[in-house]
From Swiss-Prot:
The keyword Membrane applies. The keyword S-adenosyl-L-methionine does not apply. GO terms for cellular component: bacterial-type flagellum basal body, distal rod, L ring; cell outer membrane. Belongs to the FlgH family. This is Flagellar L-ring protein. It is a lipid-anchor. It comes from Stutzerimonas stutzeri (strain A1501). Residues 1-18 form the signal peptide. One of its GO terms (molecular function) is cytoskeletal motor activity. Assembles around the rod to form the L-ring and probably protects the motor/basal body from shearing forces during rotation. InterPro entries: Flag_Lring. The basal body constitutes a major portion of the flagellar organelle and consists of four rings (L,P,S, and M) mounted on a central rod. It comes from the Bacteria. A lipid is attached at C19 (S-diacylglycerol cysteine).
Amino acid sequence: MSRLLIVVSLSSAFALAGCVAPAPKPNDPYYAPVLPRTPLPAAQNSGAIYQAGFETYLYDDRKAYRVGDIITITLAERTQASKNASSSISKDSSANIGLGSLFGGAVSMANPLTGNSMSLGAEYDASRDTSGSGQAGQSNSLSGSITVTVSEVLPNGILAVRGEKWMTLNTGDELVRIAGLVRQDDIATDNTVSSTRIADARITYSGTGAFADASQPGWLDRFFMSPLWPF
């Protein structure tokens, strides 16, 4: 019996350990910098004044618009949500049935236990009250900046950007990852764009090390908070 208990305990421990989300690792290929493509040399047109691939713009800026270009994203995320719910149900009912006379005569019957006369009247009262309330609130904020690269230019001119930033501290590593779609018109003249202007944004802020582990519950605590705990 003791051996079976040990096996079950170890199996549960390994199962709970496997449910823990893996720690993020650097050098994720998805967030790796995208280098600009080397353009193929344009065919030279002998005898022409203008050659393809050598054009310049009279009015141009330094904003990102090609694959491999760098763009700085200003993190300005702030969310706040609250919800209140309450309900109340009340119901009262009563009934009074009195049978004092029937066909002009008094109606009564003898009590089989005491022998005394008793009437046939009845009275009923009932009430029910039910009430409940609930409240929930959540707020988050993230500020800072991260510089990423343009990974793809869509046919409509939308820029797909992604990148990550790792910071090594004395208690571990902190990382910020972001991916999404940026409209070229939303890019400022200093080549920055706010994170609130990114479509389909995927923003991750996480970390590794002793500080990150201290904020996570242990494997036994996760068992008590899991659906496997019957109480």
